[in-house]
């Protein structure tokens, strides 16, 4: 009998078969470039830049844009934005540019052109007679790139927010060094006619390329990033949250991870810190891996590292951070357990509340205050029935360690203390909770104080 088969009976008939499952075509893919080739796309025939400008501008005024033509124009316009590379630019072994070289966004990627003509002749443009200036080209490019940022704003009750963002971005591209090329509210009207720009692979690729360039090169038109900046660390919310977390608690990544007391963290931490990636390399392809098509399913997203994401934001909630209170809970990743651990870590790193003395007249006054607080804490812990007398050394002011926190959790049977619950209620009850947010979770779970 083959070792990979099982045997059982169905209606008294012996059946032998090999269990098989569907192959996962959506496994996490790491963005490291292994073949030494720049990321690339294929577009239609390069247009005459001035003809393309007139056609695209006419289409924008009519709120009717052809995505293929928009992409072709954005790629052709890259050559207008020349700058000087400040340092040798290398990523994953690929030499993008040398220090002092004159470069434009196209040097970052490989854009292949076919002989397929665009729809320029059919798209209009007759209402624009004279050839555009450099400032007008830059403004149109900027407005087109802003469509990506607007399409990334999703959720309930975002209409007014989107309109305000669109208006502010329009204002940027009608003042020097740019030039006004459209009437007020044109950007929002165009967005409404086609709201899914962020799902168009070639458009996303070009937006990421522009952002990678202007993040690296000082340029008079660097304000173009107002529409592209959302491509930086896109689908990286798990890793970004962890980075913010260690800065908040002022520990190294290694020391911070010693506090992660849950078996489900193991796979997530292994996934998040896979060797061979350029997570800490400035201006790497890694920063824009999603836009550049280097990863279909990010191993760094909040869903990929859900337990880590939940814990970090429960600690953030304990610290009163609005961003954490508004973040969306990953419901499938043990939010109740993560809220317990988050309470203990919040107390460890933040204390019992927001208000405490932080500034003193001199070092002696600061030292006296610290000693007084340590004595007060030790006295209160000695009276706490949950603490065994021979375990009290774990709670002294001199001992702030993962071992101490772990012992505290175990002695309380893996449950939050009332001081933790009171803190959670205090920070979440006065916050206008969004649906499925951490604030809503805390309000629902701990509203009765237990």
Swiss-Prot record:
<keyword id="KW-0687">Ribonucleoprotein</keyword>
<keyword id="KW-0597">Phosphoprotein</keyword>
<keyword id="KW-1035">Host cytoplasm</keyword>
<protein>
    <recommendedName>
        <fullName>Nucleoprotein</fullName>
    </recommendedName>
</protein>
<keyword id="KW-0167">Capsid protein</keyword>
<dbReference type="GO" id="GO:1990904">
    <property type="term" value="C:ribonucleoprotein complex"/>
</dbReference>
<dbReference type="InterPro" id="IPR035961">
    <property type="entry name" value="Rhabdovirus_nucleoprotein-like"/>
</dbReference>
<keyword id="KW-0543">Viral nucleoprotein</keyword>
<feature type="modified residue" description="Phosphoserine; by host CK2">
    <location>
        <position position="389"/>
    </location>
</feature>
<comment type="similarity">
    <text>Belongs to the lyssavirus nucleocapsid protein family.</text>
</comment>
<dbReference type="GO" id="GO:0019029">
    <property type="term" value="C:helical viral capsid"/>
</dbReference>
<keyword id="KW-0766">Superantigen</keyword>
<dbReference type="GO" id="GO:0003723">
    <property type="term" value="F:RNA binding"/>
</dbReference>
<keyword id="KW-0694">RNA-binding</keyword>
<dbReference type="InterPro" id="IPR023331">
    <property type="entry name" value="Rhabdovirus_ncapsid_C"/>
</dbReference>
<comment type="function">
    <text>Encapsidates the genome in a ratio of one protein N per nine ribonucleotides, protecting it from nucleases. If expressed without protein P it binds non-specifically RNA and therefore can bind it's own mRNA. Interaction with protein P abolishes any non-specific RNA binding, and prevents phosphorylation. The soluble N-P complex encapsidates specifically the genomic RNA, with protein N protecting the genome like a pearl necklace. The encapsidated genomic RNA is termed the nucleocapsid (NC) and serves as template for viral transcription and replication.</text>
</comment>
<dbReference type="Pfam" id="PF00945">
    <property type="entry name" value="Rhabdo_ncap"/>
</dbReference>
<dbReference type="GO" id="GO:0019013">
    <property type="term" value="C:viral nucleocapsid"/>
</dbReference>
<dbReference type="InterPro" id="IPR000448">
    <property type="entry name" value="Rhabdo_ncapsid"/>
</dbReference>
<keyword id="KW-1139">Helical capsid protein</keyword>
<keyword id="KW-0946">Virion</keyword>
<comment type="subunit">
    <text>Homomultimerizes to form the nucleocapsid. Binds to viral genomic RNA. In nucleocapsid, binds protein P and thereby positions the polymerase on the template. Protein P acts as a chaperone on free protein N to prevent it from aggregation before encapsidating genomic RNA.</text>
</comment>
<dbReference type="GO" id="GO:0030430">
    <property type="term" value="C:host cell cytoplasm"/>
</dbReference>
<dbReference type="InterPro" id="IPR023330">
    <property type="entry name" value="Rhabdovirus_ncapsid_N"/>
</dbReference>
